[in-house]
Amino acid sequence: MKNKILVFDIGGSFIKFSLYFQDKFMTKGKVATPLDSLENLLIVLKQIHNQFIDECEGVAVSMPGIVDSVTGHMVHGGSLRYINDINMIEVFKKAFHLPVAIENDGKCAALGEVWRGSLQGIADGVVLVVGTGMGGGIIFQGKLLKGHHLSAGEFSFIRTNNEHADNVDYLLGMQGSSSVLAKTVAKAKGLPEDAITGERVFKLIEEGDHTVQKIFQEYCRNIATQIINLQTILDPQKFVIGGGISANPLLVATIKEELEKLYLHSILNFVRADIEQSKLGNEANLLGAIYNYMQSHHLEV
């Protein structure tokens, strides 16, 4: 692609950004995401844009929430609670005075895997992004499945228990959350909630901490159970596991182990899910946002 595109991956904690040109990320950076107001979010984005104002020819955005990527209308902004019922393409066009394309972050991850990652050449696939919640995207017959209400792939809202309907702890977004995993380990070790990181969880597992190993196995079993359900409903060729915690191969390896246990103890002959670790890591959303921009503006892919 000959155009220089500024790409933002706006998350609940950080905004990752890069200038993309000729199939390369020319520069990368990240800053904290303002969580108090849209005005402050735009101030931060404009400050980043000003660094590239003489080079940038368009803006690609990956962000949380329910978004119509064609019209730009956002029903809500997910973890960005100040975004509700607003056209974010128009907001960004006014801020940057450039062509803009936006898409949901989980769907961007799926598009990134289709374009440059583990779903290249795959007609039907599912991307699970393990992070603060459980995001992702669904590729059906080679195209991104958005759903009638633009909510396809919002895996965080899957219920894992038919009791306690008023308790969000039983949603997959909590059961599969890497931050909840860390807090659970901290509680089990008698430590403050914020005393354990994802990296520390893996370190404790490697050191042979049986308590943490058991917690991690249960965590992976919960994800494996939902993979079986999604395999039954969608029948994809492949699942790709992404998100920050997936950088450690132990996550996918343990999910596979727990899947095998579930298959072995079942009297039914399930179609076995094919699972792979994301090859793109933290670049999946950025690449997916670029891919969405090129498709939206009819540029050569």
Where would I find each of the regions flagged by the language model?
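Glycine-rich phosphate-binding loop of actin/hexokinase-like ATP-binding domains
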Residues: 120-175
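A cytosolic small-molecule/anion-sensing beta-strand core signal
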Residues: 21, 63, 70, 140-141
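ATP-binding/phosphotransfer module of carbohydrate and carboxylate kinases, centering on a glycine-rich
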Residues: 1-58, 69-71, 92-97, 115-117, ...
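A short acidic/small-residue loop/turn micro-motif
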Residues: 33-35, 82-83, 151-154
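Active-site glycine-centered loops adjacent to acidic/histidine catalytic or metal-binding residues
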Residues: 105, 131, 289
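A charged helix-plus-loop insertion that forms the helical arch/lid used to bind
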Residues: 73-85
